[in-house]
């Protein structure tokens, strides 16, 4: 059980059997009565944001969640298929629940999957990944103006902006949160 004094951004709580993640919170003391904690929470099953008020000191449940390393196998229609590395069980996850992170997945890649009562909710990618450039325009020789970028398609299919000197076949380091080029490998 968590108390409202434990609330912080990113804390996962359970209310009436539904997992939520606290997006924002504020302690509020009205002129009359006890203090309350105003929260903005994201329902981890639906993705919806909702506001909720708690009395100061109120207790909320701790969700039965676990992070498990899984191997990404393939895409099937609008689902991603993962395999549990210990039980070899396959788990299907709707692609829309990944919040755009599915574009970084390569077949055979091991990533961390967040599960709630055995149901996959989210994937956690490393902060940076090294991916190969499969398609980009050749850079013009002698074009040395600073900060010139061009679009490049990576092996997973996502398109990012890269400096003009990056060529097809180069391996680049990409920030998975911002989708920005970090350097060549």
Curated annotation (Swiss-Prot):
Pathway(s) where this gene product acts: Protein biosynthesis; polypeptide chain elongation
Family: Belongs to the elongation factor P family.
GO cellular component entries: cytoplasm
InterPro entries registered for this protein in UniProt: Elong-fact-P_C (IPR015365), NA-bd_OB-fold (IPR012340), Rib_uL2_dom2 (IPR014722), Transl_elong_fac_P/YeiP (IPR020599), Transl_elong_KOW-like (IPR013185), Transl_elong_P/YeiP_cen (IPR001059), Transl_elong_P/YeiP_CS (IPR013852), Transl_elongation_fac_P (IPR011768)
Keyword Cytoplasm: yes
Classification of source organism: Bacteria, Pseudomonadati, Thermodesulfobacteriota, Desulfovibrionia, Desulfovibrionales
Function recorded in the entry: Involved in peptide bond synthesis. Stimulates efficient translation and peptide-bond synthesis on native or reconstituted 70S ribosomes in vitro. Probably functions indirectly by altering the affinity of the ribosome for aminoacyl-tRNA, thus increasing their reactivity as acceptors for peptidyl transferase.
GO biological process: peptide biosynthetic process
Protein name according to UniProt: Elongation factor P
GO molecular function: translation elongation factor activity
Entry-linked Pfam families: EFP, EFP_N, Elong-fact-P_C
UniProt keyword terms in alphabetical order: Cytoplasm, Elongation factor, Protein biosynthesis
Keyword field contains Repeat: no
Location of the protein in the cell: Cytoplasm
């Amino acid at each position: 059980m968590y108390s409202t004094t434990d609330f912080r951004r990113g804390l996962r709580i359970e209310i009436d059997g539904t997992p939520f993640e606290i997006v924002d919170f504020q302690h509020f003391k009205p002129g009359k009565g006890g203090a309350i904690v105003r929260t903005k929470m994201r329902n981890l099953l639906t993705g919806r944001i909702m506001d909720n008020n708690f009395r100061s000191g109120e207790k909320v449940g701790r969700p039965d969640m676990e992070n498990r390393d899984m191997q990404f196998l393939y895409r099937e229609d609008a689902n991603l298929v993962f395999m549990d590395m210990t039980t070899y069980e396959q788990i299907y996850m709707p692609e829309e629940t990944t919040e755009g992170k599915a574009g970084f997945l390569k077949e055979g890649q091991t990533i961390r999957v967040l599960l709630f009562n055995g149901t996959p909710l989210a994937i956690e990618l490393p902060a940076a990944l090294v991916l190969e450039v499969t398609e980009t325009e050749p850079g013009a020789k002698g074009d040395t103006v600073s900060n010139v970028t061009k679009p490049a398609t990576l092996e997973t299919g996502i398109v990012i902006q890269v400096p003009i000197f990056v060529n097809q076949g180069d391996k680049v380091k990409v920030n998975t949160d911002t989708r920005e080029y970090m350097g060549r490998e």
